[in-house]
Amino acid sequence: MTKEQQLAERIIAAVGGMDNIDSVMNCMTRVRIKVLDENKVDDQELRHIDGVMGVIHDERIQVVVGPGTVNKVANHMAELSGVKLGDPIPHNHNDSEKMDYKSYAADKAKANKEAHKAKQKNGKLNKVLKSIANIFIPLIPAFIGAGLIGGIAAVLSNLMVAGYISGAWITQLITVFNVIKDGMLAYLAIFTGINAAKEFGATPGLGGVIGGTTLLTGIAGKNILMNVFTGEPLQPGQGGIIGVIFAVWILSIVEKRLHKIVPNAIDIIVTPTIALLIVGLLTIFIFMPLAGFVSDSLVSVVNGIISIGGVFSGFIIGASFLPLVMLGLHHIFTPIHIEMINQSGATYLLPIAAMAGAGQVGAALALWVRCKRNTTLRNTLKGALPVGFLGIGEPLIYGVTLPLGRPFLTACIGGGIGGAVIGGIGHIGAKAIGPSGVSLLPLISDNMYLGYIAGLLAAYAGGFVCTYLFGTTKAMRQTDLLGD
């Protein structure tokens, strides 16, 4: 049995066994477990499992185990459950000798009541933010892979222009790399539509069609569609993914209503046809123009804040981004990044936000130096620091800085310092969405590599100095504990 399989089975035991698990899924660093009864979860045992870097309680229990490991752990849990990742795990409650129906009903009612309270507590805004995260989390590997391949193509192009490399095969290679990159970015509206449909309860294929509708495929020359509000021609992709998400949300409402009123015998034919006609027309003539206005305004505001605020805006964004990652709300920026790239050719927000992770790396390096006697902490840092340099910060957040408290705050200050440098230099953007840290370098636009490196070094230094001077306690330096 591999260590990942052992970790998966220990996690299952700590959350109350397979009988207490409703479904399992994962993102880049977290195993996301939906349990039937929170009271059966042993939180302390879960947190102290070797390999678990942190635990977040939300609608799902999110167990941070780190990149790479998370896929193996989640897949093994799915194998043990007998279903695919994300699918509900069946539980046999038909045995009357083993089943106390009265207790089961009471427990179910209690669970539903707690879930309802949790939803009320979370509020509509948090629900919206989580929906956006659920739409884009499955796309993160594609963003990273396609973005880095596009970045490599850009670097090769720059080297050709500078005369360092040449040859027809290099040109062909660059073309192939760009085709692979565009396989993701050119059809992002379709991918977004499919995932949005899954999130809102619509048919995924119909969501993909609505996303594809915004691309205005086949519209060219005199055969154009007009913006009913401005009289100008509609542009392919106008309204961006913000328009797609809203349109698919409307699609989910229309489709559900149609399922209720259309007879079963013709439901499979009538419902998708009418749903696509209604929402397709609304998307082209209403949602695309309005969402286009919203997207343009949003990008203008963000660019204005970064441009006018400079050092100050950079510090605020860099310092506040780690708490957003901690809360899982950083995915709200994904639509903004994409719209900035579509309109400006680069997102000037991402390099500033990336400084948060660099500040945390600096803080972790200071802990490595200051806490030489704390072997538990240093062992955790051995696994979390390398991926931190590459822009994956959750293992450091949940495994190191957040449990210790002070280093989390000093890491935020380090991120703010790096963000201030990026904001002060200005015009440092990323051509695509990808990981932060050193891994973002190939994606930096307009050859502003040195400016980005300066920001990274400033964040490393700021996080290191602040943590070295103010981020540790005597207990951290002298004991073998990771936190209270």
Swiss-Prot record:
Record localization: Cell membrane
Pathway: Cell wall biogenesis; peptidoglycan recycling
Catalytic activity entry: N-acetyl-beta-D-muramate-(1->4)-N-acetyl-D-glucosamine(out) + N(pros)-phospho-L-histidyl-[protein] = 6-phospho-N-acetyl-beta-D-muramate-(1->4)-N-acetyl-D-glucosamine(in) + L-histidyl-[protein]
Domain notes for this protein: The EIIB domain is phosphorylated by phospho-EIIA on a cysteinyl or histidyl residue, depending on the transported sugar. Then, it transfers the phosphoryl group to the sugar substrate concomitantly with the sugar uptake processed by the EIIC domain. The EIIC domain forms the PTS system translocation channel and contains the specific substrate-binding site.
Record's protein name: PTS system MurNAc-GlcNAc-specific EIIBC component
PTS EIIB type-1 domain ranges (all copies): 5-87
GO cellular component labels: plasma membrane
InterPro entries associated with the record: Glu_permease_IIB (IPR036878), PTrfase_EIIB_Cys (IPR018113), PTS_EIIC (IPR003352), PTS_EIIC_1 (IPR013013), PTS_IIB_1 (IPR001996), PTS_Sugar-Specific_Components (IPR050558)
Keyword terms, alphabetized: Cell membrane, Kinase, Membrane, Phosphotransferase system, Sugar transport, Transferase, Transmembrane, Transmembrane helix, Transport
Bilayer disposition of the protein: Multi-pass membrane protein
SUPFAM superfamilies in UniProt: Glucose permease domain IIB (SSF55604)
Active-site residue list: C27 (phosphocysteine intermediate)
CDD domains xrefs: PTS_IIB_glc (cd00212)
One GO MF term: protein-phosphocysteine-N-acetylmuramate phosphotransferase system transporter activity
